[in-house]
Regions:
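N-terminal leader/targeting segments and the immediate start of mature chains
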Residues: 2-59, 91-99, 128, 201-219
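Amphipathic hydrophobic-ligand
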Residues: 45, 72, 147-148
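An acidic-aromatic
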Residues: 48-113, 162-182
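Extended beta-strand-rich segments in extracellular/periplasmic secretory proteins, especially
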Residues: 24, 29, 83, 96-173, ...
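Generic short beta-strand segments
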Residues: 35-41, 65-67, 140-144, 168-169
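A positional/structural detector of protein chain ends, strongest at the extreme C-terminus
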Residues: 1-3, 310-311
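Long non-globular sequence segments
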Residues: 66, 87-92, 97, 143-151, ...
Length: 311
């Protein structure tokens, strides 16, 4: 216990409290169930999901699009854990065929439970603010790598209940806010059922199809959104894209712009494919173009590219 003088008021604070108004960093526990909706304003996409998390059991499950895609991260399977993804797939002979894919962990990269909530290490209390009629604490974290500067905010009430998570990206070279996404949470509960982590029986799981570089995003889509790093797995896929399509940009500024367009394209492709539609999208030669550039190519009409790249 320690004392804090705030104006003329003497506050008695718990030993584990932060110095700002005696507020403790929210702790959502080692076991929870939560629903959410991921919003990608650039693509005008809203993607619902439902998550179950059990840290002590070394397992998690996240369903996307009302269960159309189910991901199980089981850390105790095999030597280093396994991710199982059950998802509809379009092939040359099948439409929305339900398949199971498997990604095994390694000694260097063991599988761990995937949280649907951000790790609040490094976050600081910013202010109190109403969100949809509820007075929330706002916790903030700013991270920067190179020209990428991301500001993360979480709106939360007590006992620790998440309401909204927001990322706003600023590129210092472009001097612009070029990225944003939000997650709105609901139905948070500090408990879950144990059998929810067992994948459906009777299915044979196979390796994820090519390209190999996209396996992590296919197996664990939410990891890039709740991770508070300006350089995500999606950013690391820009290198293979440039190599495949022989990209050479005239300046560092153009490189930053094209990488930003690519990230938005990649998110749009994978989020749309999780919807279980009768067609699939894919990364192609236009994935580092802006919406305006693609619109000019199509005569001013923005049309989703439904032909998956197979090169």
């Amino acid at each position: 216990m320690w004392l804090l003088l705030a104006g003329n008021v003497l506050l008695v604070c718990a030993a584990d409290a932060t110095p700002i108004g005696c507020r403790r960093v929210p702790n959502f526990g080692k076991l929870y169930h939560v629903k959410g909706e991921l919003s990608l304003p650039h693509s005008e996409i809203k993607e619902p999901f439902e998550a179950w998390y059990d840290l002590e059991g070394n397992r998690s499950r996240i369903d996307y699009r009302n269960g159309k895609v189910r991901t199980y991260l089981i850390g105790n399977d095999l030597d280093y854990g396994v991710i199982y993804t059950i998802t509809p797939v379009n092939t040359a002979t099948e439409i929305q065929a339900i398949k199971c894919f498997q990604l095994n962990g390694t000694q260097e990269g063991p599988i761990r439970p995937q949280a649907a909530l951000p790790d609040l290490q490094g976050f600081e209390f910013e202010k109190m603010e109403n969100y949809e009629g509820v007075l929330c604490e706002v916790w903030k974290n700013v991270t920067q790598v190179g020209h990428k500067k991301n500001t993360y905010r979480l709106w939360v009430t007590r006992p620790a209940t998440p309401h909204r998570f927001e990322m706003v990206g600023f590129n210092t070279l472009l001097e612009s806010h070029n990225d944003k996404y939000t997650i709105d949470y609901s139905d948070f509960s500090p408990q879950t059922e144990s059998d929810i982590f067992i994948p459906s029986g009777g299915m044979t799981c196979e390796e994820f199809p090519d390209p190999v570089e996209e396996h992590q995003i296919l197996a664990n889509p939410i990891q890039d959104y709740v991770n508070t790093s300006p350089v995500s797995h999606a950013h690391r896929l820009f290198g293979p894209f440039k190599e495949k399509f022989n990209r050479q940009y005239e300046s560092e500024k153009e490189h930053e712009e094209r990488e930003n367009y690519f990230i938005h394209s990649l998110r749009h492709v994978h989020s749309t494919n999780r919807a279980g539609l009768t067609y699939s999208l894919g990364i192609n030669d236009f994935s580092d173009w802006s919406n305006a550039e693609r619109a000019r190519l199509r005569g001013g009409i923005l049309i989703p590219d439904r032909e998956k790249d197979t090169e």
